[in-house]
Amino acid sequence: ETLSKKNRKEFAYYAKRHIDSVKENDSEAALYMTHAYADYYPRYEPNQIEIIRKAYTKVGNENGVLVIPVGLAFDLAYQKRPNIKLHDDDGTHPGLLGTYLAACTVFASIYDLSPIGMKYDYFGSIDESDKHFLQEIAHEVTSTYLNKTLK
C-alpha cells in the first residue's frame, strides 16, 4: 500500500511540525496535495487519489491551513481526457503539462483568481487547446474543493 496508515500518521505528524514552525515565524503555510501515480506505474492503486485527498484534507483542517488540490486536478484532467500526458515517463513525476496544471492550481488557490485566460504557455511549449483545458480544470477543481468563487 502506497499510503499506509503508518505513512499517513507520519505525514500528519511532520506536517504539523513544519506548519507550526512556519506559523511561529509569522508566515502562512499551505499543503500541496500531491497527485496519484500514473496508471502505468507498478505501484499505482485505483483508489490512491481518494486516500491522498482524505489525508491532506484532514491534516489541512486540523492545522487550519490551505490545501492546494493539485492531485484532484490531475484526477479530473485524466477523467475528462484519459490520453492526456500529465506524468513524466516514470509515472510518478509531473511532465510539462502536469507541471503547468499544478502551477495553474497553485495560482488559483493562493490568489483566488481564475487561471482561465492566462497567456503563459512555457515559451510556446503548450498548445492553445491544452493550455485552455488545463486552465479550466484548475479553475473547476480549485473553486469546488475550496468552495470559493474565483475572480
Model-derived regions: residue spans:
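Conserved catalytic region of serine esterases and O-acyltransferases that act on ester linkages
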Residues: 86, 93, 103-151
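Alpha-helical cap/lid subdomain in secreted, periplasmic
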Residues: 1-96, 108
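Mature-region segments of soluble proteins
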Residues: 99-101
